[in-house]
From Swiss-Prot:
Binding positions for NADP(+) per the UniProt entry: G10, G11, T12, G13, Y14, I15, G16, R35, K44, R140
GO biological process terms held by the UniProt record: benzene-containing compound metabolic process; diol biosynthetic process; ether catabolic process; lignan biosynthetic process; lignan catabolic process; phenol-containing compound biosynthetic process; phenol-containing compound catabolic process
Any one GO molecular-function label of the UniProt entry: lariciresinol reductase activity
Expression sites by tissue: Expressed in seed coats, but not in embryos, leaves, stems and roots.
Protein name, per record: Bifunctional pinoresinol-lariciresinol reductase
């Protein structure tokens, strides 16, 4: 593979910083968008400076300044956006990026901010969590209407949020004595190491096999059930947890009285652990769908038993 010019938008975020790192490690000429407000956040600014030390270029631009976005986009072949999906306003900022890419006319690949569940499959998702998927589809429509070459990334469950705490609501650390099992705990889920998400994402940018397609992440050994995840931790830690199965009705009842952010989390967990939305369909090449670990078998992805070791 050759050397690409890659612009990462949202490069100081949870997944964005890993994509910047992966891009640099793969030898690409890496640019990171520096928004004016970043200079007010010492941690983000220091992170940007660390990227610069590693050879990345910092490009000043603002979503409120169309011309600055166009200038930034004209510097590169590939644009990867990783702005947070936690706020609807952030997701729709990508429409400004789409307009800049359309005007610049030089981008060979755009990867918008998705990286979780495939929004195209979540049209019947529960409110208020459905809004995130709906807005991602608005961005997809804009991309496709503008005929922008793209790849959509469905990376499923990030380990930091779903694995270390055994997918429990609340703290991000493993429970010490009790664990709630969602349903019977036998629905298949896909868990990912965040660095592997970044690696697979960067590997797509010059690969014609992923052009204008959705790439799902299903490394075989990371497609496991909730119960298997819990048992993996028990084996590693030597600590048997008291397990309580929670029915779908009782789980959804947890939404009552919660704020919107908590309701969104509960709704998403319901789709993952009760409906099996990550694995209840086949990946279909005829529908412009591909699977990451099959395309890139050379990637030695992190298994969840190894991911959990840091929590011991």
């Amino acid at each position: 593979m050759g050397r690409c010019r890659v612009l990462v938008v949202g490069g100081t975020g949870y997944i964005g910083k890993r994509i910047v790192k992966a891009s640099i490690e793969h030898g690409h000429d890496t640019y990171v968008l520096k928004r004016p407000e970043t200079g007010l956040d010492i941690e983000k600014f220091q992170l940007l400076l660390s990227f610069k030390k590693q050879g990345a270029h910092l490009v000043e631009a603002s979503f409120s300044d169309h011309e600055s976005l166009v200038r930034a986009v004209k510097l590169v072949d590939v644009v990867i956006c990783t702005v947070s999906g936690a706020h609807s306003r952030s997701l729709l900022l990508q429409l400004k990026l789409v307009e800049a890419i359309k005007e610049a006319g030089n981008v060979k690949r755009f990867i918008p901010s998705e990286f979780g569940m495939d929004p195209a499959r979540m049209g019947d998702a529960l409110e208020p969590g459905r809004e995130t998927f709906d807005l991602k589809m608005v961005v997809r429509k804009a991309i496709e209407d503008a005929n922008i070459p793209h790849t959509y990334i469905s990376a499923n469950c990030f380990g930091g949020y779903f694995v270390g705490n055994l997918s429990q609501l609340g703290p991000l650390t493993p429970p010490s004595d009790k664990v709630t099992i969602y349903g019977d705990g036998n629905v298949k889920v896909v868990y990912m190491d965040e660095d592997d998400v970044a690696t697979y994402t960067i590997m797509t940018i010059e690969d014609d096999r992923t052009l204008n397609k959705t790439m799902y992440f299903r490394p075989p050994e990371n497609v496991i059930t909730h119960r298997q995840l819990v048992e993996t931790w028990e084996k590693l830690s030597g600590n048997q947890l008291q397990k309580t199965e929670l029915s779908s009705q009782d789980f959804l009842a947890l939404m009552e009285g919660k704020d919107v952010a908590e309701q969104i989390v509960i709704g998403h967990l319901y789709h993952i652990y009760y409906e099996g939305c990550l694995t209840n369909f086949d990946i279909d090449a005829d529908q412009d769908q591909v699977e990451a670990s099959s395309l890139y078998p050379e990637v030695e992805y992190t298994r969840m038993k190894d991911y959990l070791m840091i929590y011991l």
